[in-house]
Amino acid sequence: MILSPADQERIETFWNYCLKHQYFNIGYPESADFDYSALFRFFKFSINNCGDWKDYSNYALNSFDFEKDVMAYFAEIFQIPFEESWGYVTNGGTEGNMFGCYLARELFPDSTLYYSKDTHYSVRKIAKLLQMKSCVIESLDNGEIDYDDLIHKIKTNKESHPIIFANIGTTMTGAIDDIEMIQERLAQIGIMRRDYYIHADAALSGMILPFVDHPQAFSFAHGIDSICVSGHKMIGSPIPCGIVVAKRQNVERISVDVDYISTRDQTISGSRNGHTVLLMWAAIRSQTNLQRRQRIQHCLKMAQYAVDRFQAVGIPAWRNPNSITVVFPCPSEHIWKKHYLATSGNMAHLITTAHHRDTRQIDSLIDDVIFDLQGASKRTVGF
């Protein structure tokens, strides 16, 4: 590959930009403490995981053997026997959510998808693409789904087979919908467990809850039917990706044979990235579960540090249990743009991913926010 001098200069400028901003993502859940340099040589090859990793494929350059290892690992941490599960490495959380909703729709074709107003924006797009009826549920103050409103709307709609989209960590507040509460409330109105579907969006918290002492309900053992997690968030990856796991019996409903690749098609994407499979495989093989627990504990400790610093000066910051997302009042635009914060309405958040090994970047942000919010308060009082 030969680039013109102008293009070489342009790409060099972008390289320096990336170096400058590599760790400057405190408002978004991307862990940057990774090193996949041992895998760089594989970028010489077009590795394509089209089809089902558990079957033979006539496309020789695939990483199916590694994908099998990845899926066995996630079946274990999401508490489902490997032989009863199936899933794959996706392009990201949205594809995983679509896969879960697709399975639910095939199981209950005429049912409604219920999700809270704090759910990730992609669910609206998914419902449109899958031509599913959908219903937005109110949220509690902490971002959890409003269980009373959920049951009220299911009863109002006379829904016999609701499809529940549960958040295992909402985008803005890290709130976790109570899987067990949802099942209890549905049982109270006479809906049997076999008559509804629960998909869990665990994009960030799916790699937190398995490694804390007192996790909220999140797994197949707690009653879910499918779950997805992002690979580029808590795990960390230079390429966005994700993992989705479902019950094999439900996946078999959508599976079809494809003759020209000699394998079965049961994924959303046809061609799939075989390199991200290698990244996820290396990530899970290079750390023990004890090391993951220690990494998560560090992130949680940093999150609590941020809450304490804000609260010490009277700023009402908070976080949900087992969450590394710290919520606080939205500062002025020049502050949230300076620190690349995610904002929604009158709130902003910071996320203490694992590359924050000390408090320097957190302190820099908090100092600016304190100065900004306290200055705004003084200006309001003076006026």
From Swiss-Prot:
The residues listed in the UniProt record as binding substrate, with positions renumbered to this chain, are: 120
Under which EC number(s) is this enzyme classified?
4.1.1.22
Residues with the modification N6-(pyridoxal phosphate)lysine, per the entry, are 233
A single MF term (Gene Ontology)? histidine decarboxylase activity
User: A single Pfam family, by name?
Assistant: Pyridoxal_deC
Q: What cofactors does the UniProt entry give for this protein?
A: pyridoxal 5'-phosphate
List the GO biological process terms.
Answer: carboxylic acid metabolic process
- Keyword set, alphabetical order: Decarboxylase, Lyase, Pyridoxal phosphate
Task: Reply yes or no: does the keyword Ribosomal protein apply.
Answer: no
Q: Does the keyword Cytoplasm apply?
A: no
Q: Which reaction does it catalyse?
A: L-histidine + H(+) = histamine + CO2
Q: So which domain of life are we looking at?
A: Bacteria
Q: How does it assemble?
A: Homotetramer.
Q: Which family does it belong to?
A: Belongs to the group II decarboxylase family.
Q: What is this protein called?
A: Histidine decarboxylase
The gene behind this protein is hdc
